[in-house]
Design a protein with these regions (language model features):
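Long, low-complexity, mixed-charge
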Residues: 1-155
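Conserved beta-strand/loop scaffold segments within soluble protein domains that form the structured core
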Residues: 13, 24-28, 39-42, 123-124, ...
Length: 438
């Protein structure tokens, strides 16, 4: 008689376990079914790209290296342009993906940070599946769908996993790089970044192509999760070739009292890029800051914006954009703030300089308020360089071309307050390097 309750409890447990396994299977199946339905779905904004024009590189076709010093001299130079130090000085970890191969990971520099490729991370942590395709949906458009279906077909997820452990504050940044070394390749990556409770994480990501690459495509899906009291600074530098198509897909989920700072820099020519990272401020007193520098050159089409959805009391967001259009470039500078509850604040600022009669900037500031007692504001201004400023500098013996360059560089300078002193200096160096030639 005494065994029946035990057997009954065991049967209930087995049924619950069976249901959980079934739900996991259905969840995975739904991801891929959603992706299959969206494989031809155009993105809501931006130029439509025919992804069939690009080839799927075999995963892990390139051998791993033991040290970043094993890279060629030219590749090291290309990486340095996007903030990746092959000597790993003042870094807490490193990750390098070339085409579809993770060729280097260094997880041994800091005790506070975990860095690994997604395939290894998924094997180590069963709970990581819960973070995949959560804030970025597989059916958002054909680019996310393609990334999800490649994961299914190849059975391996490309991209990086970075996690700061609870209560730790690592000052030195992790560096991660997505590098394209072959023409006509479509590179995909699915990255997960987690800042555990009361931790601090700094991440520098550089994306670039080899010196001899003409055409290629990059799709990077990044999902970031900030637990209560945590902070992430995410600095991204892009240096693409002129015929590369770029489609980052990024979303961030913020818990109570967390802070997310995003710095984005693009000053090299590109075919087209369309990116609209979204921060969901779901926690009380959470804060999201987006700052971007966009330098349009040649016939680049740049469609870059930032969005913050303020869903919790005390949440704040700032979106600041600086854009300069040269040659025949086109820049669409977007910003979107949505306040859904009382006592939230948001500010959007978009400024642009048009330096050529054949270029243009289209500023799209959006404010959305669906609650009372909130503060939302925006500033937008697009124009040319002031003649008075040029005359002031030339009157002091500075050549006109150099004077114009100085004004543009000053206009594009980014406020890097909020970063640790050591990281602030490194970030400023990256900005200065990116603005070389502007």
């Amino acid at each position: 008689m005494g065994q029946f309750p035990v057997q009954e409890t065991l049967m209930k447990f087995l049924k619950i376990l069976e249901k959980m396994v079934l739900m996991d299977v259905l969840s995975v199946r739904n991801v891929y079914e959603d992706a299959e339905r969206a494989i031809n779905k155009k993105a809501a904004i931006g130029a439509d790209i025919t992804i069939e024009n690009f080839t799927d590189e075999t995963i892990n076709a390139i051998d791993m290296i033991d040290d970043l010093d094993d890279l060629s001299k030219q590749t090291k130079k290309d990486l340095l342009k996007v903030g990746v130090d092959t000597n790993e000085e003042n870094r807490s970890g490193s990750f390098l993906q070339v085409d579809q191969s993770n060729i280097f990971t260094n997880n041994s520099i800091s005790d506070s940070i975990e860095v690994m490729n997604m395939g290894v991370a998924l094997e180590k942590y069963s709970w990581l599946e819960d973070y995949m395709w959560n804030v970025v949906k597989p059916d958002a458009d054909k680019y996310t769908a393609k990334t999800a279906l490649r994961e299914k077909e190849e059975g391996v997820t490309s991209g990086y996993f970075v996690r700061s452990l609870p209560g730790t504050k690592e000052v030195m940044p992790v560096q991660a790089c997505m590098f394209i070394s072959d023409t006509d390749v479509m590179q995909t990556a699915h990255n997960i970044v987690i800042a555990e409770e009361n931790s601090e994480l700094h991440l520098i990501t550089g994306c670039a192509t080899g010196d001899d690459i003409s055409s290629a495509m990059h799709v990077g899906v990044s999902e970031m999760y900030l637990k209560p009291g945590s902070k992430i600074t995410f600095t991204m530098v892009h240096n693409w070739a002129e015929e590369v198509e770029v489609r980052p897909r990024t979303a961030i989920k913020l818990a109570d009292n967390s802070t997310y700072i995003n710095n984005y820099i693009l000053t090299s020519p590109v075919s087209t890029i369309q990116s609209f990272p979204t921060a969901y401020c779901d926690g009380k007193n959470s804060r999201a800051i987006f700052q971007s520098i966009q330098g349009g050159k040649k016939d680049s089409i740049i469609d870059v914006g930032s969005r913050a959805i303020l869903n919790a009391e005390g949440a704040k967001a700032e979106v600041i954009s600086r854009a300069v259009a040269q040659d025949e470039s086109q820049i669409f500078a977007r910003g979107h703030l949505a306040g859904n509850v009382p006592n939230v604040k948001g500010h959007l600022e978009c400024q642009g300089l048009v330096l050529s009669d054949d270029s243009f900037i289209y500023a799209v500031p959006e404010l959305e308020a669906s609650s009372t007692n909130l503060e939302m504001s925006h500033e937008a201004a697009v124009g040319k360089i002031s003649e008075d400023e040029i005359n002031y500098l030339t009157s002091r013996g500075i050549p006109e071309e150099e004077a114009e360059s100085m004004i543009v560089r000053g206009f594009l300078n980014m406020d890097i307050t909020g970063l640790p002193e050591e990281l602030a200096q490194q970030t400023q160096n990256m900005i200065d390097m990116s603005l070389d030639g502007i």
